[in-house]
Amino acid sequence: MLTRIRNAGVGGNAARRVRLLAGYTGARMAHAAALNSTTGAGGAARAAGAGRRAHSDVHVWALRQQSGIHRGGQCILKQDREPDQSDDKKVPPRAEEGRDEEAVRDEEAERQPREEQANRSSEASSSRGSGGSASSAGGGGRSNPPSEGEVPRKYEELMVLPMSNRPLFPGYYKSVTVYDPAVIEAICGLLRRNIPYLGAFLLKDRSMDKDSIDSIEEVHRVGVFAQITSVHHGVDVDGRKAMSMVLYPHRRVQLDELVSTPKLVAEAKEKATDDGLVQAKKEKFRDMSEGGEEEENPTEFLLETGVTVGNFSDHLDLPVDHSSVMLNALTSETLNTFKHLSSINATVKQQLIALSSITTSLKPNIFESPSLLADFAAAISVGDPNELQDVLETRDVEQRLEKALVFIKKEVYVAELQQKIEKETDAKVQKRYKDQVLTEQMRGIKKEMGVEDAKDKAIATFRERAEKLKFPEHVKKIFDEELARLSGLESAMSEYSVTKNYLDWITSLPWGIASTDQYSILSARKVLDNDHYGMQDVKDRILEFIAVGKLKGQIDGKIICLVGPPGVGKTSIGQSISRALNRTFFRFSVGGMSDVSEIKGHRRTYIGALPGRLIHALKRCQTENPLILIDEIDKLGRTGHQGDPASALLELLDPEQNKTFLDTYLDFPVDMSKVLFVCTANTLDTIPRPLLDRMEVIELSGYVADEKVKIAERHLIPAAKKSTGLGSANINLTSDSIVALLKNYCRESGVRSLKKHIEKIYRKAALKIVQQLSIDDTPKSAPAETNIEPENGKPDASAKPLTNNLPAPEPLNIPDSVKIDITPETLVEYLGPPVFTADRIYEKTPAGVVMGLAYTYLGGCTMYVESVLGQPLSKDSNPSLEHTGQLGDVMKESSRLAYSFSKMFMSRRFPNNRFFEKAAIHLHCPEGATPKDGPSAGITMASSLLSLAMNKPLDPTIAMTGELTLTGKVLRIGGIKEKTVAAKRSGAKTIIFPKDNMADWEDLPAHVKEGLIPVAAEWYDDVFNVLFGSVTEEEGNNVWKDQFDLIERSKATASSSN
């Protein structure tokens, strides 16, 4: 297009050059404003400014058109103009992508003849409109556009183009983009027929954006009659074909009716009848000339394209009374407002200057024509489309100018607001730039002086850390706020250290850093088996945990509680689990903890405030998914003035809540759901019930002798030899010695005491070897100690202190000839006299003594129950029951229940046995220093009382456990494995337990059950048959016959004497 402008100037055709330059400038500026309007809310101000500049600059050239210099414009096809994408309002057209060269060549070959034909048609039309003159100097044979008189005042029917953003005003260019193929084809047909005209009307629904309408109610009835001045073909970013064109509105028109719509054309095509819509319209607009020839309407081809076609009529202004005071006042105020606006907006000022320079040659003058002035004001304004449409529809020039003045006032307000914002922004930018320059200069000065700024270094460190981390959105916001706050604090301020420490903790946590979980079942099993012997329940649970994670693709955090006696390996199995899962291990103990701040941290305002143990764990492990072992959770401190730690753990150990664990120090949620928590406890009785419900409990029982032997051989002995420096020595601790060690020295459920005794044995062996080899480790040449006094009584500064820089001794190589065998007989030399000299307290139990089984936090153990007569049976004795042995409330109730049951049972089985009528019984549980309680001694106490009542000793190799009801039902108990281990350790051969525990017995390992005869009792009769099955009814009735005969005789004698 620039080429055409230059060529027009060479030939001296100034009018044509002015017209082309106006079209070119208007198209570019209107298109730039349209592009800015698509940038969203953030570019609203820029779009508004661009729109105003576009409309205002275009108006300068529009005035020349109205003055006769140029009206209308030539329709420039794609091949007639230089590539320029500024005419497209919505998206800049671009060459189609993704097509091969051959397809492009084929399309160009097909399109070239059509375009040449269109060029010839357009040039011929221009030549006809301008009288046939053509520019001669490089004009390419193109003629001038038609003059004002050649713009048609009326067409029978024209295409209707809906506008979505704002209405068009006469005399002001507008860039429009269409996508509908039918509309594009129709426009091309108009250009080929040299009818570059259409009607543009504003859509009522702003959300709609389409190129055709089906109902006249979809648009406002008043629009403009516009000329297509240039077009450009292309595709948008989505690959759709598009046509950009620049419209020049000539006058206001009113849409009278719709002749054709896409919907009507589609229906007509479906009916495919001869008297269809298209044919009917052809006949309607076909006239016969005087010579009898038929003449077609030049725009009737639009009826076949499927676009919206309508009939228009001019929308003329009402007569203007130029002597009206109101009109003159409005004109004056509008001009003054333009003057004010030009003083604020430099762009508007340049536009008005350009208008003033040419206004003298234009008729009518825009500053003297209220109608043109109102259109100019509305055209350069950015307002609501409906309000602008109201200005377009107003026929009364005075009212139109008044409405346009409101828009100009708004523009002034917006310009003033923009000016204010610009000044404030410039002030802030200048201040920031000044501060930045001064800060950089200060930094340079300090660097030259060798003075390092601690605050800047800390901020740089925090920023460097933050770049390597993946902060969550809420943490990133807090970090930025605190870092900005730190940069504004002086190093001497108290808040400086608080904020610095807070940022240090935030950037020290492993945000977005996690260790890679290990999903190999074989590898995990190997790690667990190598570290621990037994513990099959725990190992199976961990392998199940890994298997689920492998199927899901991730291992979720869990809360596991390991419960068992001391020394069974609860803490060490936690370390093995972390190795099996390839997770970092962290342990902390909560035993005796009574301050909730240890869990959730202190408030940041306190001096020396720190986060809780969990945040420390994340910082130490540097992963988001460590394994944290909370040790001794059953020994948490009780509620006090410092809070309840157990309640603080409720949030942490709840899988549904620990995603947003809130540490008091950090004061923002931290995701702990990826952490695997393993808790340890010796008993469940002291763990709060709400806390216990949140954990998956796995019970670890004590070890039997065979398991302890294996653990000692595989783990304890090699570790003890290594720790005592006897790794290569020939020291042999035989299996028999280990068994003797367990029998005589270590009868606990775990192996902690066994480990201590083995270490003691090897320490004694190390001493014996060193003494046997007679090794003298005294230094060969030790410096003599001298005490030389200085002559003047002052120390000599040049004197150097004496030092003994002897080399470190090398490990001793023990000869192979040194050999020590530790046998059961020689254990006394290493460990002293045996602690336990017998398997049981009673090798032969008297009547009333029964071996019971108990389960404590130390594991299973035997508990004897003894019953004796407090005084001989006599006529003066009264029945009673006394119990001792530090029995708890539950065992006291069990003793009273057993006493009542025994009386009932004896009266039913042996009615003539009157023992309980006169017996004052004392029931005792040995080891009175140890508190005893629990619901599993019922059958043991009843058996002890019945043994005393029948005066029959029981088999010392029978052990029993189980609770008893008043009617003789044997109830289920817990700790069957631990009690079985204790029975076997004490030499029992028969074990009696409730029948409901039979499933627990079946689950026991074979080596635990080996050598024991199980008796599952449902009622006490089953227990009685095992203990007293050989007692006949006669024997049971006559046990105390002699004593009661004596009592009866004594009573008879006493009554006869009275």
Curated annotation (Swiss-Prot):
Function according to Swiss-Prot or TrEMBL: ATP-dependent serine protease that mediates the selective degradation of misfolded, unassembled or oxidatively damaged polypeptides as well as certain short-lived regulatory proteins in the mitochondrial matrix. May also have a chaperone function in the assembly of inner membrane protein complexes. Participates in the regulation of mitochondrial gene expression and in the maintenance of the integrity of the mitochondrial genome. Binds to mitochondrial DNA in a site-specific manner.
What's the protein called, per UniProt?
Answer: Lon protease homolog, mitochondrial
GO CC terms for this protein?
A: mitochondrial matrix
Q: Quaternary structure per UniProt?
A: Homohexamer or homoheptamer. Organized in a ring with a central cavity.
The alphabetized UniProt keywords are: ATP-binding, DNA-binding, Hydrolase, Mitochondrion, Nucleotide-binding, Protease, Serine protease, Transit peptide
Where does the record place the region Disordered?
Answer: 72-151, 778-814
The record, for InterPro entries, names: AAA+_ATPase (IPR003593), ATPase_AAA_core (IPR003959), Lon_bac/euk-typ (IPR004815), Lon_lid (IPR054594), Lon_proteolytic (IPR008269), Lon_Prtase (IPR027065), Lon_prtase_N (IPR003111), Lon_prtase_N_sf (IPR046336)
Bias kind Basic and acidic residues: ranges: 78-97, 106-118
